[in-house]
Every structure is written in structure tokens, then in C-alpha cells.
């Protein structure tokens, strides 16, 4: 009797923020397409956003560890965090011994460290992907024992110790590229504007955007505005709207199919997390970027400046963000459609439609070697 072929087992981990979760989820879903040969586990914290996203996909199995970010000050919290690190590493060792993964992939966030370190202890091949110009602390540490490192930005290489580094771009879902060869029509009467403050939302961006776009709509500008407020900021932002039933000004707590909104948008106002930038460029959308001012090593501003250099984006620092500044920037673009066309065309410099397939192929190759 012919024996059933053993399935390949993969551990994928990345957590807490969308910038870490979505690359991991994209890879996990791609691997799970071959259900006959692959079994995919996602390791994260059940209390965090990754659990809510992963549980929507029955083909993925979620394994939870109770671990989170490191306190930056010496305190009792730091002492307790150390115990959590030990316990989470032991739990990860248990998971690895139980399921025997062929390889492990981490996409950033403190939640990834116990699992990746456990993999190192048990001599499992490890690959990491980092999205930003300045890699996070976990990526810097894990790069010392990872077999492969995948990056979005060339500039990030200098921070990492691994000898096997490749610039792949960010792994984003294929939906962002579907029909991307269709050019946006910037000569249309009504321009579609999308405002999004990242997966967590951003109240400062919400406040300024609502004030500016209410004024522009009242002045007769032909715009359709969609604002992703973030769940926790939705009610507070809704209170700022003078006309809550205006079909041309829509607030949403969260947009599950953000690719559809980006494809329709002629301009996006957003934070500059690396994953958001990849999604923006994949859909050829001109952008006004407002970096999160408290990002580690100011990496969001560095990300935004990379896009600004090639004229596909305008970077406005949050400290300089006022209604007048944002209004002037938007009106200048509305009145200069050719500028929007050029910005849209220049996004191709950063658009990497093969990134997901390349990363998955390298990861599978790592497990086979």
C-alpha cells in the first residue's frame, strides 16, 4: 500500500500591528493554497489583532503565546516581562516539538521572538522579513541566527548581520494588483480621496482631514471622501461631521477590503508604515504621507522620504500638520491633475508585484535545504 506523503509544516509569526500581521498573513495564505501538501500554523497573541484576522481563515491554525512588547524602563513590568519571555519560549519549544515545522518565518513584532528563538534552539531553519528602512529590534537580533533575510528597502541591509539578504519588496495580497494595468482617470470631474491612519487609526489625521474636506465640499469642490477612522476613533470623529448623511463624505471604522478603496482613489492621505506604502504603490495611488512621529528610529518618516524622492508622494510631518497646510497641499494637487498623473506613474518604482511569490519560493526552498 502506498504511504501518504507527509505534509510540509510551516510556522508563520508576526503580530500586534497591521504592518507586521498582513505580510505574515499573505505568506500563510499563499502557502495554504496547496492544502494537500502544506499545513500552516500562525503563532501570535490571542489578545491581539492577529487572532481576529487569522481566525477568519479555517485553513490556518492559530497557536497562541502570551507575549508582548518590551517595557523600555527598568521596573517591575520589565522583570515580569522577562518571565513571560522565558515562559513563551518554552511554550514555543513545545509547539515546535509537537508539530515539527520544516521552517519558520517571522515578519516582525515582539511576539515573533520567542517562537523564532525556540526554532534556533531546536536547529530549525529561520527566515525573517522586515518592511522598513530601519529594521525593528527583533529583526536585528534574529538576523544574527536567521538563514535568510528578506527586505523591502536596500537601506535596511546595513543594520542586519545575516549574510543571506535579498531585497524582495513587501508580500502583499494579489488583490492589490488585480487589474492594476488599468490606469486611473485623473481627468474625471469627481476625485476620490481616501484617508487612512494605519490599522490603529490616527485621531490627529482624522480631525484635520474632516475639517479640511468639509470646507472644500462646502466651497463646491467635486470630491468623494472616505475616511478610515480606526475603530477606537470612529465615534469621536463622527461627532466632527456637520452633515452625517452626506453621500460624498463617508466615515468607516475599518475597511476590510482596502484594495478596492485604493484602486478607486485618486489621492490617499495616510501614515507611512512600509506595508501601507507597498499597497499604495501597488495600486498606483498618489499620496500625502503623514509619518507617525513616535515610530521607532523615526522609520516612518524615512520610509516617506524614500517615496518623496521619486515624486510619487508628498511628506508632511505631523508637527507641521495644520488645516491650512493640508488644505493648500490638497488644493494644489486638485488644481494640477498632471502632477497627480506623474505621481501615479512614479509609484511603479516601488511596486513589486512578484514579492509575495518570491518570498514564498525562498521560504519553501529554505525548508527543503
Which residues make up each language-model segment?
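A short, glycine/small-residue-rich beta-strand->loop->alpha-helix junction that serves as a flexible
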Residues: 14-25, 203
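A short, well-ordered alpha-helix in the C-terminal region of glycosyltransferases
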Residues: 339-353
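Active-site-proximal region of nucleotide-activated glycan assembly enzymes
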Residues: 38-41, 60-61, 120-181
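C-terminal alpha-helical cap of glycosyltransferases
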Residues: 352-369
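An amphipathic, basic-hydrophobic alpha-helix
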Residues: 72-103, 121
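Donor-nucleotide binding loops and adjacent catalytic segments primarily
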Residues: 48, 53-58, 177-268, 301-305, ...
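Conserved nucleotide-sugar phosphate-binding/catalytic loop shared by glycosyltransferases and other
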Residues: 6-17, 34-84, 231-233, 317-319
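Acidic donor-binding loop of glycosyltransferase active sites
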Residues: 101-103, 263-278, 285-286
